[in-house]
């Protein structure tokens, strides 16, 4: 870990042959879950609570809008570009009734850092 996080909980996870950590980012309060083991496939996911106020589908529209780029990052469809040149083992975005998630995975360290 590093000095920007406080370890809230640590425990062995036998099913994954590893150790699980729940961390809290000291500055933002963001919760981070880390599972450390010997698996070559590295996975990262960022997720947000997105409870809808109605049934118009705004969280799902926002999921796609986030991936449309911006002035600072002018890339129309980053997933398409990543798939072209990435060794990813998983790359997606998902909206559930109460949350939106963006998971990525790769067995290649350099590629994983680029995702």
For each predicted feature, which ranges?
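M16/MPP (pitrilysin/insulinase) zinc-metallopeptidase core fold and M16-derived inactive scaffolds
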Residues: 18, 36-114
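N- or domain-start disorder-to-order transition segments that initiate the globular core
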Residues: 1-41
